[in-house]
Amino acid sequence: MATLREHSGWGPTTAVLVGAWLLTSPGTFGYGESAMAISDRVVGATAVIFGLLAISPRRAWAAWVVFAAGFWALFAPLLLWAAEPAAYLNSTAAGIVLIAMSVVVTRLVDRQAADQPAIPPGWSFNPSSFVQRAPIIALAWLSFLMARHMAGYQLGHSDSAWDPVFGEGTENILTSEVSKAFPVSDAGLGAAAYALEALIGYMGGAARWRTAPWVVALFGVLVVPVGIVSIVLIVLQPVAVGDWCTLCLASAAAMLAMVVLTLPEVVAMLLFLMQRRRQGHGLWQSFWRGGPMDDAAAEPRAARLSDPPSHVWRAMTQGVTLPWTLAASLALGVWLMLSPPMYRIEAVAGDAHFVIGALAITVAAIALAEVAQVVRWVNVALGLAMIAAVWLLPGADVAARLSATVAGALLAMVSLPRGRIRETYGQWERWIR
């Protein structure tokens, strides 16, 4: 472990270099008189001073100061409404690197010297393996790039926002009253959140569900509840704004996939903390420092990204299943969202189709995670709500009402049976119903 910590000394030294870069950037790129110039110089000086201090293992606390500086640099262009593209690029990129070099690199190896055993008791796979996390990290970076493009338009760095499907839809949404209600660029806020998700995805070893529960918890909070709220807000844009956004929908799809892939690791972490508490260990200490878990199994051979594609895909999607019932639920959700323009449903009835269809898609997608199949029961209620809404609310003719009634009834029925479960989950299996 000591050797690994010594090898991670290049993290603080890289932070020093990034700090020097920020110190000299305002004058180099022509924004020396702006608020962003002050921010960059303060962050740069902080990174240089505390990066040098963090090189010594005795002053590991200094790395957290560098982390705080990087965190500010990531959000500073949004809070200060950076008018210069170079200032936005510089501060965002530097913030990402500072966070990575100060905390992520040093946390690539957990407090425990060994990552084994890595498979939770009764489980058939390791939810914290890097191959399991790789698609989440990739989707987070993809979403970051899309959100950054939209943030550039909101901050005035570009004259247009790219939208190959809905024309000016993206621009209309980014300049809508809903977006203007945010004190900062909402697209930029999303970009910063995606960057943090990707960075936290790298942290911890192959057994971080028990060796670094706080990392998994932070990762889960950023991806699951925050992600679900973001998804719902995005898919409801036609109701709130009256337009669609291609990049927003692509981000929502990526976030849904991230939620599904993250849930098994979060469940494993919760089971670990529950066992530690039953054994009399302090929950607070277990949360921050981790520990061993009884009956955990060693991973015979962890999958690698260099393995054959079929093996990698199998490892990436362990814990995810698409039974025909959930596939049908997804299709019915799409049908409900497309029904208003097809049947010319107007007023509140049209909004009900959009809302219930979007929620049905979100619920069915989350239920693709075998550990969360129980949430499919929400679609039973949504199906019944659709039947009631289409007959009680104005704006739909007889054909539209019959279509919604059939779709709602089918949604409720296909959500009743549980789909096939391929993996095993130990004590959590009693909740998979």
Task: Spell out what each predicted region is.
Residues 52, 382, 389, 395-396:
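A charge-rich, low-complexity, intrinsically flexible signal that marks solvent-exposed coils, linkers
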Residues 426:
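Active-site-proximal polar cores
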Residues 2-5, 18-20, 24:
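N-terminal signal-anchor module of multipass membrane proteins
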Residues 66-73, 379-386:
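Central hydrophobic cores of alpha-helical transmembrane segments
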Residues 7, 24-39, 46-49, 58-60, ...:
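Membrane-interfacial helix-loop segments of redox and metal-homeostasis proteins
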Residues 75, 232-235, 388:
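Transmembrane-helix signature of multi-pass solute transporters
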